[in-house]
């Protein structure tokens, strides 16, 4: 990510919903706080005690499931892809792969999860990314992700 002085490029929830097909309870990006087409994107997800997953994961010790952290990263990846490429009617970016996922700290109710995805490589409609979710500067999850344009 570049460190030059510039105004952050924000994408609010209303626009996110025009870009992604996901809806409650599976829309897992609240706001994009900055991005650079074809390079990187930073977003946030505020974790509420009212998240439906906490009913069963776990009733007396609520922890955001790792798969939902990965899904939030995948949705961030999709947002970057949609903002980078002109899309023909009906085209989507599909989550196509994951490697080297590591979970380093729990994400709990009340946390603000910061999501960061960066393009590593793009070839023949497949884009590879590195993704990282943090809470208060501490890494919660890191993974290599891929999406496919279809």
Curated annotation (Swiss-Prot):
PANTHER family, per database record: 3-HYDROXYACYL-[ACYL-CARRIER-PROTEIN] DEHYDRATASE
Pfam families per the UniProt record, alphabetical: FabA
Family: Belongs to the thioester dehydratase family. FabZ subfamily.
Annotated GO CC locations: cytoplasm; membrane
Species for this entry: Actinobacillus succinogenes (strain ATCC 55618 / DSM 22257 / CCUG 43843 / 130Z)
Enzyme class: lyase
Keyword set includes Ligase: no
Protein name per the record: 3-hydroxyacyl-[acyl-carrier-protein] dehydratase FabZ
GO BP of this protein: fatty acid biosynthetic process; lipid A biosynthetic process
Active-site positions on this chain: 57
Function summary: Involved in unsaturated fatty acids biosynthesis. Catalyzes the dehydration of short chain beta-hydroxyacyl-ACPs and long chain saturated and unsaturated beta-hydroxyacyl-ACPs.
Subcellular location: Cytoplasm
Entries under InterPro entries matching the protein: FabA_FabZ (IPR013114), FabZ (IPR010084), HotDog_dom_sf (IPR029069)
Gene Ontology molecular functions: (3R)-hydroxyacyl-[acyl-carrier-protein] dehydratase activity
UniProt-listed Enzyme Commission number(s): 4.2.1.59
Reactions catalysed according to its record: a (3R)-hydroxyacyl-[ACP] = a (2E)-enoyl-[ACP] + H2O
Assigned keywords, A-Z: Cytoplasm, Lipid A biosynthesis, Lipid biosynthesis, Lipid metabolism, Lyase
């Amino acid at each position: 990510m570049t460190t030059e002085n510039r105004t952050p490029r924000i994408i609010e929830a209303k626009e996110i919903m025009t870009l992604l097909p996901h809806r409650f309870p599976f829309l897992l990006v609240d706001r994009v706080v900055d991005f650079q087409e074809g390079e990187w994107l930073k977003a946030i997800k505020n974790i509420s005690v009212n998240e439906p997953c906490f009913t069963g994961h776990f009733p007396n010790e609520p922890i955001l499931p790792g798969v939902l952290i990965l899904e939030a990263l995948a949705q961030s990846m999709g947002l970057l892809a949609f903002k980078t490429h002109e899309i023909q009617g009906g085209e989507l970016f599909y989550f196509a792969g994951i490697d080297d996922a590591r979970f380093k700290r729990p994400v709990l109710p009340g946390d603000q999860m910061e999501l960061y995805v960066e393009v590593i490589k793009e070839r023949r409609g497949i884009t590879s990314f590195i993704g990282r979710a943090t809470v208060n500067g501490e890494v919660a999850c890191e993974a290599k992700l891929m999406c496919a344009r279809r």
